[in-house]
């Protein structure tokens, strides 16, 4: 309760400082709209359906690209940890590509797929898959050796060993990798939606782009706040409960 009150007070102070900067004329309302202006935009966009439609389009793209990235990254990570040749090739490539900013994939996506939905999905997948590969590989390699020896002593080999020992033991690393992959996917999609203009549906990134084009800073900041809230809700509703479960079950994790 005390933590909630302190956090609420902190954000109220931030809003008060924001309001003061606008009212004191330190920043022009054109560059920094007041909290009231941003709130009015969000209410208007919610009432006419613009915000809901853009959010649903963005979340749908994110989920599709993210899960495809997991389906590709998880097996690749397992192969990387199991075979030396794959580690020296796919593993090195994954490590290098993870450091590449997601926005760098946009020119390739536009050249290969054009102004299409596939271009944005490609950028999201590229932002996700390499984090999952590295996290899976790291998770398998950080399993306590005693687990592997005990499994071998008890006759666990092959698929049984992987499904009953290796994967469960590496779950904390896998969840961390999926969480990181989600963050990279989210950023990748925002960059893609800002740069890729398509007619199949306008997402939150498009609202950011058009807000900038129209110098509507209330729209830009309002959409940014929506993006932040979605990210926080995803962490609290999806990843935090899983991390708490892993901590209680195995004594690992961050919480």
Language model features: what each stretch is:
Residues 64-94:
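Transmembrane-helix boundary motif in ABC transporter permease subunits
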């Amino acid at each position: 309760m005390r933590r909630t009150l302190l956090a609420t007070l902190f954000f109220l102070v931030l809003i008060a400082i924001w309001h003061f900067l606008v009212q004191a004329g330190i920043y022009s309302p054109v560059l920094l709209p007041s909290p009231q202006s941003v709130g009015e935009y969000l209410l208007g966009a919610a009432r006419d359906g613009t915000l809901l439609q853009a959010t649903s389009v963005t979340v749908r793209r994110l989920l599709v690209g993210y899960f495809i990235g997991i389906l590709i990254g998880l097996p690749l990570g397992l192969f990387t940890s199991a075979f030396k040749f794959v580690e020296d090739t796919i593993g090195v490539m994954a490590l290098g590509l993870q450091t590449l900013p997601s926005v760098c994939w946009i020119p390739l996506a536009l050249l290969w797929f054009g102004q299409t939905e596939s271009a944005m999905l490609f950028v999201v997948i590229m932002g996700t898959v390499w984090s999952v590969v590295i996290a899976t590989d790291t998770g398998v390699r950080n399993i306590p050796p005693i687990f592997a020896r005990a499994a071998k002593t008890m006759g666990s080999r092959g698929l049984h060993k992987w499904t009953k020992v290796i994967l469960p033991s590496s779950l904390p690393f896998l969840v961390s990798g999926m969480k990181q992959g989600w963050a990279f996917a989210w950023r990748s999609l925002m960059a893609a939606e800002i740069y890729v203009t398509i007619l199949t549906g306008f997402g939150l990134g498009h609202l950011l782009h058009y807000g900038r084009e129209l110098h509507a800073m209330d729209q830009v900041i309002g959409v940014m706040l929506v993006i932040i809230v979605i990210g926080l809700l995803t962490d609290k509703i999806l990843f935090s409960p899983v991390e708490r479960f892993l901590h209680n079950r195995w004594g690992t994790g961050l919480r």
